[in-house]
Every structure is written in structure tokens, then in C-alpha cells.
Amino acid sequence: MIIVLSPAKSLDYDTPAHVQSYTKPAFVDDASELIDGLRKLSPQDIATLMDISDPLARLNFQRYADWSTTFTPANAKQAVLAFNGDVYEGFDAKSLSSADLDYAQQHVRVLSGLYGLLRPLDLLQPYRLEMGTRFPTARGKDLYAFWGDRITRALNEQLETRSGAARVLVNCASTEYFKSVKPKLLAAPVITPVFEDWKGGRYKIISFHAKRARGLMARFIVENRITDPKALKDFATEGYAFDAAASNDSTYVYRRRVGE
């Protein structure tokens, strides 16, 4: 079983890492190619391209200037500890044991506009480059064209080491990021967990809660060493419960109704 997550825009390089082990990203050469292109942009160009504030554009202008093909704990941090958004609050990697993180290293992958595909312990230098950014390169008009089928092939290398029910990809990423994966080329079926909360008289996806729940699901898989997708139906964290009637073989729906 492989779980894919989206990255986070918010990063934490202040909290010391509680594990010393780390690995190097697989697609450093590709990331370096993107950085070379990003370095040609002015802060104003970056602000316009990414629709961000001038201070944030200047910050990322400097990040691109500082970025190096040499990754060390001095200039980088393990990805799953550096990302700090809603998904990663749910995953809460800083409270996972070393054994849990070792398991996550084999089963969790993070999709990234700059790095392509990251393992949890891959060192991450700070950046901002969302997968949906229309940043043209020699490979095409945007990052989906840039990455092509590279991410899918890398996932297949991992999926092909699994067998039986364990050969499955659990999509806990956003639509924007999962578009970088080509499901028809995957060597495994895809299961997408969907999290809905009751609001305004009906169940609906509420972004903040759904993002956190994706992280909770990834943690549930890691802590329980789940390999059979049927066991995903037992997920019942923070009030969510599997809804068989709303689900099918490729979409597992979890619903929560609180505060009434």
C-alpha cells in the first residue's frame, strides 16, 4: 500500500527534528532545472505568477537564490517534519516513533511541484511552487507537462514490490496534486478517501476538516501497519465513520455529524 499526500505551503524550520535519519530526494536534477527557471524571475514576476503578496514573493525569490543541489541538515529538513499545513497537523509526524517513521518512509509519498515525489524523510529545502502553477518550461506549458509520467513511474516502482491486496494506492492528495499522477498507467487500483461533515442540512466536504482528515487517515495506516484496503473502513478517528451506502470500490466516504 502506498499513500500519497499533498504538500503544505506553510513550512516549519524552527522546531528541531526529533529524528536524525534522512534521505535525499529522488528528483534533484529535475528540481534544479525548475530552480534555474525560477531564478530568472523577479520578485514581481513571482508575485504575479503565484498570485502572492510582495513580501512572500521576495521571500521565495531569496529561497530560489539560496537553493542548492547539496542537501544537508544545515540547509534542509525532513519533508514530513518541515510541512506544516492542515494535512500535517492531522498526520502529526513529530509524535510518531522512529519505527513509525521508518514504516512511513516505505509507504507514504508526498507529491510536490518542485520535488516531484518525496519520501517522508527526504530532506526538503524551503520553497513555494504549487503543482497547479502555470510555469512554462522546455517540457511544456505547466508543471503537469514538466513532470509528465515521471511521478507515476516512480510510484509504480514502489507498487510493483507489493502483491495481492497490498498493491493499492490510497489517494489522500488534493485534486490539484493528484492530477500529476496518471491512474491509467499505475500498476495498482486507486482508492480515494472522501471526508464529509454535516452542515446546513446535508453532508459536504469542508476543506479544513477534509485536509486534516487526510492526514489522520495516513497516520492511521502507518500506526496500524495496514496493508489490506478493507481495513481502511475501520477508520473512526475524530468522529468520522465509514459510510458503505455512499461509497464504492474506488471511493471510500467517511462522514461526521457533530454539534447537534
Swiss-Prot record:
It comes from Burkholderia lata (strain ATCC 17760 / DSM 23089 / LMG 22485 / NCIMB 9086 / R18194 / 383). Disulfide bonds: none annotated. PANTHER family: PEROXIDE STRESS RESISTANCE PROTEIN YAAA, PEROXIDE STRESS RESPONSE PROTEIN YAAA. Belongs to the UPF0246 family. It comes from the Bacteria. This is UPF0246 protein Bcep18194_A5551. GO terms for cellular component: cytosol. One of its GO terms (biological process) is response to hydroperoxide.
